Regions:
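Conserved non-catalytic scaffold segment of RNase H-like nuclease domains
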Residues: 5-114
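Alpha-helix capping at helix-to-loop junctions
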Residues: 90, 97, 118-122, 143-146
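Short alpha-helix plus adjacent loop in nuclease-associated cores
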Residues: 131-146
Length: 146
């Protein structure tokens, strides 16, 4: 079927997850872990990056328990939240074209990226556009074969 062919056509798969300060759109992404694998599932890249929480934000106590995050980790990271988002955006851009996937990506992670990029003065549709672009390239390739 077409979904199986799409997976076979992708040269890379990016599997990612986020840690956040809250489970709502008002929270901020504070950590991203990603692994890039080829079509044989061999690791060809990875990202594990943590940024500081934006100033003035109050994290959810429940999120801190889930993330095992201390106040020091939230406030004394190497990257400002803006620089952190830029590094993540650059990594995902370099990975494309690829299939992006994870455990709760559609319901949570992708939505958090959208709102965090928007709040951080970055292009909020960056991750979604990479995925749409990959689908369009595949569809065009399939149409040209007909």
């Amino acid at each position: 079927n077409k979904q199986t062919r799409l997976v076979k056509k992708m040269d890379k798969i990016v599997i990612y997850d986020t840690e956040t300060t809250n489970s709502t759109i008002w929270g901020s992404i504070i950590e991203v872990g990603a692994v890039v694998v080829d079509k044989n599932l061999k690791e060809i890249g990875k990202l594990n990056i943590r940024g500081r929480m934006p100033e003035g934000e109050v994290p959810s106590a429940k999120a801190l328990l889930v993330n095992s995050t201390s106040i020091d980790l939230l406030t004394k990271g190497n990257y400002s939240h803006y620089d952190f988002l830029g590094a993540v955006e650059n990594f995902f851009t370099k990975c494309a074209p690829a299939m992006f996937m994870g455990w709760s990506n559609l319901n949570f992670d992708r939505r958090m990226f959208h709102f965090n990029f928007f709040k951080g003065n970055r292009y909020p549709y960056a991750l979604i556009l990479h995925q749409i672009k990959n689908m369009m390239v595949y569809i065009l390739q399939e149409q040209l074969k007909l």
